[in-house]
Structure formats: structure tokens, C-alpha cells
A protein has these predicted regions:
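Catalytic nucleophile-loop/oxyanion-hole region of alpha/beta-hydrolase
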Residues: 64-76
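Glycine-rich, phosphate-binding/catalytic loops in enzymes
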Residues: 40-44, 74-75, 134-136
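Conserved HGGG/HGGXW glycine-rich cap/lid loop of the alpha/beta-hydrolase fold
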Residues: 5-66
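Conserved acidic catalytic loop of the alpha/beta-hydrolase fold
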Residues: 73-92
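Conserved alpha/beta-hydrolase catalytic His-Asp/Glu region
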Residues: 128-130, 148-198
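Flexible "cap/lid" loop of the alpha/beta hydrolase fold
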Residues: 101-104, 108, 115-145
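Conserved alpha/beta-hydrolase "nucleophile elbow" surrounding the catalytic nucleophile
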Residues: 95-100
């Protein structure tokens, strides 16, 4: 069973699993709406074995991010969350993609809050091509164009039958995976933070 909520400092979460220990999963981005629908099912499936012994919290970023908010600022929000909601840690953390950028700062600035750290699909700095695609994705999503946003990553695939097939599948299934953002400007703030990130 999954449960959605918001921590006292405004960070949204989705919780599932059983056990005395907790694991925080810093969700990717850009976008701070917690996963739902098919995307949530994909995450619960990916963490199924871990959730048999742990309570897994998928956390995003708080809503209403001001212009210029950085991945380091976001890591400070997570530090407050760990202190307030998880007895000051230490706690296991998995940073996925954009969440991995944030986890790097948390580990560097607050190592006492982390027991174990896994960084997946993230580097110390994003590649220029990827950052441009993320920005385009954020721009389209912030306009509510979910299908168009979903196809932005296809720019990395050469033209041909394979690309056309992927485009069709993405176009077909996007409504099951993505919804229009609650706070569109936050996508742009996060995409800009990703462009500035250099841990």
C-alpha cells in the first residue's frame, strides 16, 4: 500500500514498504510532483525487494521554488527534513538522476545525516546536450504539453523506424505516466539548477 503526504518543511513524498528502517529516494526531475499512476508502479516495482524490509520514501522538492534556487539549496531542504522527520539520521539515501545531483551536496555538506548513499544516473555535472534536452522538457511540461515533452529525449536517437516506433509508444503511453505539473514554474527552476550544478 502506498501513502502520499507532505513533510513539515513542505517536501512531498510517497511512502510504501514495511520495516523499521527507512530509505529515502531523491526523485529525478525536472518536476516536483510525486510519481503517480504507472510511474509510481514502476518505482514500487523497482524497489520491491527493498520495500519488504524497509519503508521507502520517494521524495521530491517543495513547491514554489524561487528563481535561482540551486541543487545545494534543495539539499539543505532535505537536511532539514532528515533532522525533523527521521530523528536526525543517519539514513540510507538513493539519489536518482536530478535527485543524485542533490544527494551529492547533502553528502558533502551533511555527511552525518547519511548512513549509506547510492547515486544512480547522475554525475558531478550534466552533459551539455542532456541539459539542453532537460530544459526543453521543462519548458514543454510547464506549458502542459506532456506528450511533446516526453518525446524530447528522442533527439539522441538517429532518425529511422526505431525512432518512429519509440515516438509512437511514448505518444500513446505518456498520459498514463505523466500529468500536467501542479506548479509549472518549478520545472523551469529545477532545469536551471541542473544546468548550474557542478559538485
Amino acid at each position: 500500500m502506498t501513502e502520499k503526504g507532505v513533510f513539515s518543511n513542505g517536501i512531498p513524498y510517497v511512502r510504501f514498504g514495511e520495516g523499521e528502517k527507512a530509505v529515502l529516494v531523491f526523485y529525478g526531475g525536472p518536476g516536483n510532483d510525486p510519481p503517480s499512476g504507472l510511474m509510481l508502479r514502476m518505482f514500487t516495482g523497482a524497489f520491491k525487494s527493498l520495500s519488504q524490509n524497509h519503508v521507502v520514501y520517494i521524495v521530491t522538492r517543495k513547491f514554489g521554488l524561487p528563481e535561482g534556487y540551486t541543487t545545494r539549496d534543495m539539499s539543505e531542504d532535505y537536511a532539514v527534513m532528515i533532522r525533523d522527520e527521521f530523528n536526525g539520521g543517519p539514513i540510507d539515501v538513493v539519489g536518482v538522476s536530478f535527485g543524485g545531483f542533490i544527494a551529492q551536496h547533502l553528502a558533502a555538506d551533511h555527511p552525518n545525516l547519511i548512513r549509506r548513499l547510492v547515486i544512480a544516473l547522475a554525475a558531478y555535472k550534466g552533459r551539455e546536450e542532456s541539459l539542453q534536452l532537460d530544459m526543453r522538457y521543462a519548458e514543454l511540461m510547464s506549458q502542459g504539453k506532456t506528450r511533446e515533452a516526453s518525446t524530447t529525449m528522442l533527439a539522441t536517437i538517429p532518425d529511422g523506424i526505431k525512432k518512429s516506433f519509440y515516438k509512437f509508444i511514448i505518444w500513446l503511453f505518456t498520459p498514463l505516466i505523466l500529468s500536467k505539473p501542479t506548479n509549472p514554474n518549478d520545472l523551469l527552476v529545477e532545469a536551471k539548477a541542473a544546468c548550474e550544478h557542478d559538485s
